[in-house]
A protein has these predicted regions:
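Active-site environment of divalent metal-dependent phosphoester hydrolases
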Residues: 23-27, 52-55, 80-85, 205-214, ...
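Divalent metal-coordination and catalytic microenvironments
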Residues: 21, 44, 49, 64, ...
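Active-site neighborhood of divalent metal-dependent phosphoester bond hydrolases
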Residues: 60-154
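Acidic, His/Gly-enriched loop-helix segments that form or flank divalent-metal centers
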Residues: 127-229, 236-240, 252, 257, ...
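SH3/SH3-like beta-barrel superfamily modules
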Residues: 285-312, 335-370
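Short, basic/aromatic beta-hairpin or loop at an interaction surface
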Residues: 258-271, 306-322
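SH3/SH3-like (including bacterial SH3b) beta-barrel domains
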Residues: 271-286, 321-346
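N-terminal active-site segment of His-dependent metallophosphoesterases
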Residues: 1-63
């Protein structure tokens, strides 16, 4: 599929809302829009990846379709959206089986998959289908409206000051991209690290911002006013501690914005003060190979780039003879009594939490808000 470019001019004096990578978290989208009092006077841009990696992909698609009908909304296609469409429109039984196998695995990660949801509405269990070609043909017929909506999502949205694209663009000569394949613009891993700069702001999703955090383990948007790049993806659905990031600009001409976030993590209230640590390490995907120093039942001792760290034992795992650790830090957060923290997990080390988009440890007493 070739790149589809949409050009619009935003009217003056209307709020511009933007988020990306909803990944089937319809509840999060719904709560965020309610929280910010989203109205027909606003403009919403959704920078790709509506489906998968969350519990309500089908509801998310239908919600966005309805928002497009009732409000001013500009959704873009993401790489996961495209891949799912390619699989659903394939007549190859091997592709069908691969999607079914993925769905079985996805139940352990996110409760279900996009394919599971589609089949559930029709009363099927994907792996019980004797004729996958017939099954997928029936899905295409029953969900023709939803699939058509996804198929026609643009790749790039250009406005007066901003260019929105799920993965990234190599330059701002957008007409040159019209005849190119769209997938490289949707799946541009570590786009921000490639050193590009632009005249207009380029707003992307796809790559969780925490993967750019060489120091502070931050999940909030990355905004670079020098290079004119905004990275929105808070890792929702990809990481247990991920979040949906919603940026709001009061007007298309404004440089100032406000951030609203959503996460499904439970909330606790801190009862004690705690000072932040100044010396800490952060292990993240892509830089998560470690040396196992001591294996315990609750806690394990590991080494990451020569620095020893004690972590919850369940964070350490092996694959192909190598040892890895899930995203973790030994950062101790600055906390005051009354602070609301999002609880990721607990261990003998304390409570592993997120505060203002930053993950770390809180070792004091707390009250559960459940």
């Amino acid at each position: 599929m070739n790149t589809i470019i949409q050009r619009v001019e935003f009217p003056d004096n209307r709020r511009i809302l933007m988020l990306s990578d909803i990944h089937g978290h319809a509840k999060g989208l719904e709560k965020l829009l309610k929280q910010v009092h989203f109205s027909k006077d606003d403009i919403l841009v959704i920078v790709g990846d509506l489906v998968e990696k969350g519990p309500e992909s089908l509801r998310t698609v239908r919600m966005v379709m309805e928002l497009c009908r009732t409000h001013t909304v500009y959704p873009l296609m993401g790489n996961v959206d495209l891949w799912r469409l390619e699989h659903l429109f394939s007549d190859d039984p091997a592709v069908h089986q691969a999607m079914i196998s993925y769905s079985i695995k996805a139940r352990g990660w996110w409760k279900n998959s996009f394919l599971d949801e589609l089949c559930q509405e029709l009363g099927f269990i994907p792996e019980e289908a004797e004729d996958t070609q017939a099954l997928f043909a029936r899905l295409r017929e029953h969900f023709a409206a939803e699939f058509d909506f996804l198929l026609h999502l643009p790749t790039v949205l250009e406005t007066q000051r901003m260019i929105f694209v799920h993965g990234g663009i190599p330059h701002e000569r957008l007409d040159e991209l019209k005849e190119t394949e769209r997938i490289p613009l949707m799946k541009w891993d570590h786009f921000y690290e490639d050193g590009l700069s632009f005249d207009k702001y380029v707003v992307v999703g796809h790559w969780p911002t925490t993967l750019y955090s060489k120091g502070m383990p931050m999940y909030n948007p990355l905004i670079d006013h020098n290079r004119h790049i905004i990275c929105l993806d808070g890792g929702c659905g990809v990481k247990d501690e991920g979040q949906l990031n919603l940026l709001i600009y009061p007007d298309w001409r404004s440089d100032e914005c406000e951030l609203h976030t959503w996460t499904d993590l439970p909330v606790i209230t801190a009862l004690n003060a705690q000072n932040a640590s100044t010396d800490f390490d952060y292990i993240r995907w892509g830089d998560h190979e470690v040396e196992l120093l001591e294996q315990g039942t609750e806690l394990s001792r590991i080494s990451h780039h020569g620095r020893a760290m004690t972590v919850p034992a369940e964070f350490v795992w092996e694959r192909d003879g190598r040892t890895y650790c899930s995203d973790i830090t030994d950062l101790r957060l600055s906390v005051q009594p009354g602070d609301r923290l999002h609880l990721i997990t607990t261990s003998p080390l304390g409570a592993f939490v997120k505060k203002d988009g930053v993950i770390g440890w809180y070792k004091g007493r707390y009250h559960s808000n459940a």
